[in-house]
Amino acid sequence: MSIETIADVTAPLRTYAALLEGRAGDLHQSLLRYYERERGMHEQISVKLDDNKIAIAIPSLKFYCLSRNRLAFVGKDLIAEIEFFTGKDDQEISILKCYLSTEGKFSFCSVDSEPQYDFYHDRTIEPALFGQLFRAASAKKIISI
């Protein structure tokens, strides 16, 4: 179904915007906590959280990326889109997009892509996200791995 009236936009925003923005912030917090727990990552990777955005760097590979969040509609469903991007030659390059639904489903690349994770109960999201991010950066020739 598509958006047909202003209420199709305002009702989901009123009901779910704060929830989805909070979940996006929770994702960033969980990535930082995962990084802090994994001792092997500290020597080669830097992860910082600032203003509800995450910055990931691998200095030896000259890799740096940031995240940004936005709300978007898929049909009449409001979702949170978390994008990881980098810059090159004054241009932004999207590396990976992740999606969070109001039902707590988390996915990579598209809203319907598999696997779908349970955002609040699946503890494999963080390592999967780091893996997807580095594979996507490699596929786009941003890093070589």
Predicted regions and their residues:
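Charge-rich, low-complexity N-terminal segments
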Residues: 1-53
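Acidic-enriched, low-complexity/disordered segments with a strong bias for Aspartate over Glutamate
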Residues: 8, 26, 50-51, 77, ...
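Generic alpha-helix signal with a bias toward terminal, lower-confidence helices
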Residues: 21, 25, 32, 43, ...
